C-alpha cells in the first residue's frame, strides 16, 4: 500500500512538472516563426459561380520551442469567395471567420484546407481574384499565405431541350453545360465555329433530331469536360477520359454533319443507333475524337462517312462498325489508350447486323497491339470490305483474302518498342500528351492515292500533289 501511494505521488509530480514544461515550451520570441509549404496557393481557373476542389498547404514549427497562433483569419473575411479550414476548424460565420489560440508544438505541423467559389464577372477573359490567410503569432509576428484563383465568366446551360431549330454561336464566351442537351425529333441544333462547350460529368448531347457542327479551320468547335484543374501537378483533367457523356444519335436522327470539331475526354465519343441504311446518318469531317473511356465512334447498322478524322485512344474500339455502310477516307485511327491494357482495337468490324459494307481509303490504322483490325471470325458472306492505299497494323492476310487489300502497307508487328514513334510527332504515355501529325520521314508520306484522297487535310491545309496517308498532311 505504501508503495502504491508513493507511485501516485511520483505520477502527480511528473504531471505537474510536465505541465510546467509545456508552458515553458511556447515562445514569445519574434525570432520564432512558422515555415509554410508555399507562400502562394494557386487554385487554377474556375467557371463563374462554380466551386473548386479542395486544395491544401501545410505549416511547420521547426523551432526549439512551441509557437502559439493567437489568430488565423482571411484578410478580406468571406468577401472574396475563399473558404478556409484550419486543422479541422472552418473559418465561418459562427466564429467570425477566424480561429484563435491554436498551439503548434515543436516539430509539429498543421494542415490548412482551401476551397473557392468564383465570382461572376462581366468580362471575357479569366480574371484573377485573391485573398490572404493571415497567421498572427502570440509574439505579435504576422505571417501570410496568398490565395489566388481565376474566374472565367461562362454561359450556363442546364438541361437544354431543343424542340425548335436553334443556333449556338459563342466564339468569345465559354458555355458550361449541366445535365446535357437533348435535340428533339424534327429540330436542328447548329453549333457555330469557335464555340467551346464544357460538359459536366452527367452531361452530353442526345440527338433525336439533327445536329450540325459548323466549325472552320481557324475556328474549330471544342466539346470537352468541365474540369479545368489538374489531377496531378503535371496532368490536367482534360487529358483524362470519362469526364462527360459524349454524343448519342438515336434511330430517328439523320443528316448530321460535324465539321472541324474536337471531341475529347468523354465516355463514348459518338454512338449512332440502328437506322435506315439507305439514308446518311452522319458525316464527320476534319474532326478529332480522342481519349474516350468507351468507344471513339460506334456505328450500328447505319450509313456514315468519316473524312480527315482522327480517332484515337479509347478503352473500347476507336471505330466499331457493326452492320453499317461506312466510308473511311484519309483518317488516322491510333489506339494508344494508356489507362487499361485490355483496350480494344483501332478498328473493329462486326457482322452482327447484315449486310456490312466498309471502304477504307488513304488511312492509318495503328496502335500498341500487333493486331489493330478485328474482322468477323464467323461466316462473313454478307460482309464487303476494301482497304486501299492505307497503313494497317496487322498480320498480312492469306492469299485468298488479299483481294480486299490494294496498295496497302502492312506495318511490322515486330515493332513493339518504338510503336508510333516512327509515324507521329508525339506519343508520350507518361504525361498523356499526343500529337498525331506526321513526323519527318514518316513512311506514309506520299503514299496516298491522289485521285481519291481529299484535297485538304484535317487542319484544312491543302494537300500536296502526291498526298500523304492519314488525316494530317506533312508540310
Residue ranges with predicted function:
Residues 59-63:
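Asparagine-centered strand-capping/turn motif at beta-strand->loop junctions
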Residues 16-19:
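C-terminal motif of bacterial Sec signal peptides marking the signal peptidase cleavage site
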